[in-house]
């Protein structure tokens, strides 16, 4: 009897120790996330504004949704609906600043690092924190983050990492995937699909690897697991379709999110061309994101080495990378933040370093590399900077007519709407990549129909006889000096 009670006591003590370790880890990772996002994200309160056009477009749509505007129908952009819902939540926290986006970024990085920590514990890694700090710094100081923060790729990282960790946990334990596992993977894949469907190459590779593993591990559960994952995937999709149907704009959602994206970013025709572009993309990103790419590449091969006796785990990494990379870069558009999901592989570098170095050396190495990475961040030099063309133009508009409408005609939404609390009255309220002539004509029609009083352009002189140039300023965007112009309508009807 005494042995039984002693055994129970040891179990309780072990559980208590594990919970204390988890609480300590969570607190440390939250602190790292808070530090990194606060210092390096332009959404942080240390910066006057986040000037990145994409993040401002997302937030403008989120703010518009709170005022009754419909995504895709009333305000146009071509990312997934779940992203705009996240930005609507951010706008609920603050509709005149990026405070809500900042909080979402902190939580997103924390969740990602938490998943990395769980994986490192699974791999029995000693001293994981120096490596996790370095990974966090590598993310927020990379060129992929220098636009300002708040990209789809950044917010999708924890979802991708959670599925990777869950899959490796089952494979390394040689366990079959449960109903809950398959359903959850399906839900998370659907969530990413509803943010940016080209990221789902990650899940295509994961699905192939898990089907092969499950077929060997417990073939009788294979079909059930596939159906459970499909069911999980369909839940968010069907809810989305239902909500758009009830809102009366399902056709706009389908035309924009699928029709526009598939037509404006066509895949290359031949396999050789695709392979060439994939190779070219890697060297483009190596040049623009050297630390992130090197960490991730070395981490990828470190993971393959780590699992050399676990072919299912090794194949999982290879298939995820190939499918994600292939689908992401078969086109001819390379933008810095597209590569950000590759950082998921960097975590496999930490166990190898941990085995070869003691804690003090790891801390010193992590601190030194973190400082070097920080010097490469283009965001840091704008901390505390005050005064902007957005503030000047909006102040001028409001001094003439506090309730006057204004629109970006030639240029990106860089916070002009946010500065004045303006909800655009035209569907095409900002320039976007691959803009069509139809969009430009519809924007001009909206300007005339709704008698927009003020127009703002970037690097373009407007040739509109009914508008006069009233102000011109230079400002920095994407590392280059731009010329901004403010026009006023001559005669309002």
Task: Locate each region found by the language model.
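Transmembrane-helix signature of polytopic, membrane-embedded enzymes
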Residues: 116-140, 157-158
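Membrane-interface alpha helices of multi-pass inner-membrane proteins
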Residues: 180-208, 235, 321-330
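Short periplasmic/luminal acceptor-recognition loop of GT-C membrane glycosyltransferases, typified by
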Residues: 382-437, 441-463
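Membrane-interface transmembrane helices that cradle and orient dolichyl/undecaprenyl
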Residues: 121-126, 161-184, 291-292, 297-313, ...
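Transmembrane-helix motifs of polytopic, lipid-linked glycan transferases
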Residues: 103-124, 162
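Short acidic/glycine- and proline-prone juxtamembrane loop motifs at membrane-interface regions
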Residues: 145-155, 335-336
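Hydrophobic/aromatic-rich transmembrane helices and adjacent perimembrane loops
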Residues: 201, 325-360
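Hydrophobic, aromatic-rich transmembrane alpha-helices
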Residues: 32-35, 114, 287-325
